[in-house]
């Protein structure tokens, strides 16, 4: 395990200045695991970024207008993660590539070796577990994004 990695925690960041989030009772501290996961990967690849930066890429459109397209009741939907990465790659000139690997919980071993191989080669992954109704491994009724790495 690489103990020198930066490990942002979503509870340490706030978007209290965004009035639209107050109106829909959404906050980074409770529901920001997706933006925090993206920031954790990118900061450990050497990019200067934090969860507030990534959350704002999801929450505001390219014209700077608040846009809740990628929000769900208690978090960010999976399209929001991809949208954020694509915006960061294009707008912030972040030179990365990524793969999307979906694992069916009814057959989890199908991609497990692929993920293990990627980790052994120094890659990091953002994974989504849950919601708890679908996966007994999740503590969250809404699911949770997290980063796995060496």
Tell where the protein language model's regions lie, with residue ranges.
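Active-site-adjacent structural segments surrounding the nucleophilic cysteine of cysteine proteases
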Residues: 1-78
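Conserved active-site-adjacent core of cysteine acyl-enzyme catalytic domains
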Residues: 53-150
């Amino acid at each position: 395990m690489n103990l020198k990695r930066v490990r942002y925690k979503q509870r340490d960041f706030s978007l209290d200045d965004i009035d639209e989030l107050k109106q829909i009772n959404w906050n980074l501290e409770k529901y920001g695991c997706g933006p925090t996961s993206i920031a954790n990967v990118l900061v450990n690849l050497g990019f200067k970024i934090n969860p507030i930066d990534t959350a704002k890429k999801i929450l505001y459109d390219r014209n700077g207008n608040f846009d809740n397209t990628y929000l769900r009741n208690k978090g960010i939907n999976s399209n929001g993660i991809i949208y954020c990465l694509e915006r960061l790659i294009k707008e912030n000139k972040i030179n990365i590539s990524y793969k999307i690997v979906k694992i069916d919980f009814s057959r989890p071993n199908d991609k497990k070796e692929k993920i293990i191989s990627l980790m052994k080669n120094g890659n990091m992954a953002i994974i989504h577990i849950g919601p708890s109704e679908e996966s007994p491994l999740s503590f969250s009724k809404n699911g949770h994004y997290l980063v796995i790495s060496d």
